[in-house]
A protein has these predicted regions:
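His/Asp/Glu-enriched short active-site or ligand-binding loop at hydrolase and phosphoryl-transfer sites
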Residues: 191-202
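Active-site flanking residues adjacent to catalytic metal/cofactor-binding acidic residues
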Residues: 31, 67, 142, 170, ...
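Acidic-and-aromatic substrate-binding clefts and catalytic sites of carbohydrate-active enzymes
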Residues: 43-45, 73, 148-149, 175-178, ...
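Short acidic/histidine-rich active-site segments
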Residues: 69, 218-236
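Active-site metal-binding loops of divalent metal-dependent hydrolases
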Residues: 33, 69-70, 114-115, 172-174, ...
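An N-terminally biased module of ancient metal coordination in phosphate/nucleic-acid-related enzymes
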Residues: 1-104
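Non-catalytic positions within long, well-ordered alpha-helices that form the structural scaffold/packing
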Residues: 57, 161, 216-217
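Extended substrate/RNA-proximal surfaces in nucleic-acid metabolism proteins
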Residues: 2, 75-193
Length: 238
């Protein structure tokens, strides 16, 4: 696919989108993405990240939560992420001013993190060295391995709550070890669920798609994120 040609098509005709932003990401808010460049397995180049934000503007988005991974395999320091975010925010402001689009509004960018529930997270939680989600800083985006939960999964979620945070479980539809009753138990604990926007389209396969539909049917999701790692995902599924 010629990304430049597709970008021109989008910019000239934003209504060419398959889905309105309110359908894909309700309220024009992306609660989970990997657009912050060069910090994890997501976007690597500032240029590509800026292109992604330009596309989001054209789609009518309002807020974007940049949520890079923090885990033992990707041990991002919160101080480093804050600095990268501050620099990127300046680059975006400069890019927007240079483009000066009369019919668009600048996106509001926010920094949080997607936290793997592992030994590193337990250390960070104890030290309160975290990047929470939400305007009031009371939400904490967490994930587990796709294949198995940590042995102390529920106890760790309770520890998060005791620290004053509400855990938000990223893409619960993707966890192969979870059964319907597991989702119910988590909701009874007060855990919020964040759906990946393109799970419903089969991005992760039919089993995940089916689980996503079931969770939607039972109104278990609280927020939606793109989990965007690269531009091609936008063109394929939006």
């Amino acid at each position: 696919m010629n990304i430049f040609r597709e970008a021109c098509r989008w910019i000239c005709n934003p209504t060419a989108s398959k889905k309105a932003p309110s359908e894909r990401l309700p309220g024009g808010i992306d609660w989970h993405c990997h657009i912050l460049p060069g910090v994890d397995d997501g976007f690597q180049e500032v240029k590509k990240s800026l292109e992604m934000l330009c596309l989001y503007e054209g789609a009518g988005m309002r807020d974007v939560w940049l949520t890079p991974h923090i885990m033992e395999d990707v041990p991002n320091e919160t101080t480093h992420l804050r600095q990268v975010f501050a620099n990127f925010q300046k680059q975006y402001q400069q890019d927007f001013a240079k483009r000066n689009p009369a019919d668009r509004k600048m996106l509001r960018l926010h920094l949080a993190a997607e936290n793997m529930l592992d030994a590193l997270f337990e250390k960070r939680l104890k030290a309160n060295d975290l990047l929470p989600l939400g305007e009031d800083g009371k939400l904490l985006l967490v994930e587990t391995s796709i294949f198995s939960a940590p042995m102390n999964f529920h106890a760790l979620l309770e520890r998060i709550k005791n620290k004053g945070y509400t855990p938000v479980l990223a893409h619960p539809e993707r966890y192969l070890y979870m059964e319907k009753r597991d989702y119910g138990k988590l909701k009874l604990m007060g855990i919020k669920f964040q759906r990946n926007a393109f799970s419903i389209d089969g991005q992760y396969g039919k089993k995940v798609q089916k689980r996503c539909k079931w969770l939607m049917k039972h109104d278990m999701y609280d927020m939606v994120g793109s989990d965007m790692h690269r531009l091609s995902i936008f063109w394929q599924y939006w």
